[in-house]
Amino acid sequence: YWGMRVVYVALAAGAVFAVYINGVAEGWWPAWGERPTVAATTTPPINPAPTASATASGEAAMSGGYQIGPDGVLVRPAEHAASTYTKPQLPEEAKENTERGAELAAEYLLDTLTYAWNTGDTQLFEDITESGDNFRETYIHNVNELYSHGWMYDNSSTLTRIVSVEPVTDPKWNAQPNTIGVVFNVVTSNGTSCVNKRIITSNEFNVSVIFFMTWKDGRWVATRGEVLHDAQE
């Protein structure tokens, strides 16, 4: 598998998504499914801005069925609060220095990333990834950037196939000693997210995920990560 030819390698899905949400926040382009407004129109907006009388009466400002918070960001629905998500737990077998242990640690890593997107809490993801790795730092930045003016729920990553779990020994990969390469096929979705006052929904898409899991200091840590689109073996 490590000799595969990649037809097109995309940036990590979170990096692409972060560019998009930043563009929405800055007004560079409309959100998915949102038609650009026409400057001169006699048609009233579907969701007009709250009137002075409404806000003065103490009623909360609303947009698209969502309450607008004091920071100008739509309020996250209580039924999808970050507190409704359970922290993933590292399986005991993932603590063993075996190929199976590396595989389970990689699955747990996927779970920590999903948890980070849904809650804004990147600590578990940080703990199992090596500081300085581009994959790690990009995702931490993107999650923090989103939660600085928004939120996300129903983000998901479903493992559909374990493609490969094997030692990485070829020098061309510049892997650290004691590294196991783990390759998954995954169906993923960004779920529903909010950027300021805009709601963004995502469809599912297929990716291949590669983790270099390295046994260091008595545990598995991801020393490299990659998300591939339209890859061909």
Where do the PLM segments sit?
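Exposed beta-sheet edge and beta->alpha loop/turn motif
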Residues: 2-9, 16-42, 166-233
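Solvent-exposed, non-transmembrane amphipathic alpha-helical segments
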Residues: 23-26, 126-129, 133, 145, ...
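A short, amphipathic edge element
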Residues: 148-170
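Core segments of small alpha/beta cavity-forming domains
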Residues: 70-154
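Juxtamembrane and targeting peptides
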Residues: 9-10, 14-104, 108
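Short linear sequence motifs
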Residues: 1, 13, 59, 78, ...
